[in-house]
C-alpha cells in the first residue's frame, strides 16, 4: 500500500451489506462457502460492533464480521447469528472476512484481522475462533493455531484459534 493511500476502517452500515455480499461471493463462491445477503444483514443487526469494513479509494475493499459465543465449539456453515450470538460470550468467532480481489496483497486482510482482535479485547473475549478454507497463512501471522481440519458438505475447513489472553493487549 502506498504512503498516500487513504484507508478507513469503520463499522459496517446497512448500505454496505450488498457490497460486502459481493466481496464475499467473489472470495468464497469457488469454495462453496459464500454467505447470503440476509445472513450479513442479521449479523450487522445482532452485533454491529463486531462488523467492520475497510474503505480505500472511496470503495469498500475488505470486511470482517464476528459474533460472541458462551462456549467453545466448532463454527458451522450457514449458521443463524440470531441463534448463535451471545452478547455476554467471551469467545469471539470470526464468521466471515475477505478482501476484494483487486485489493489483495496490500495488507488489508491483516488490518481487518488486527481490528477484529482489538474488538475481541474490548469485548472482554478470551479466545478467537474461526474456520478457513484457504487463508491459513494470514491467521498464522497473528499467532492462530490450527485446532483441526473438518469437512462439511464436502468442503475441507481448518478450524483455527487464538488465545488472546496470552496474545497481549496490542493487536
Name each region found by the language model.
Residues 113, 118-133:
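Conserved GNAT acetyl-CoA-binding A-motif
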Residues 12, 97-99:
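Hydrophobic adenine-recognition pocket in adenosine-nucleotide-binding enzymes
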Residues 132-133, 150-171:
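C-terminal "cap" of GNAT-fold acetyltransferases
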Residues 99, 105-118:
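Conserved acetyl-CoA-binding loop-helix of GNAT-fold acetyltransferases
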Residues 122, 133-155:
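Conserved active-site alpha-helix within GNAT-family acetyltransferase domains
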Residues 60, 64-96, 104, 152-157:
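Conserved acyl-donor/pantetheine-binding loop and adjacent beta-alpha core of acyl/acetyltransferases
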Residues 30-57, 65-84:
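Active-site rim helix/loop that mediates acceptor-substrate recognition in acyltransferases
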Residues 7-20:
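A short beta-loop-alpha structural element at the N-terminal edge
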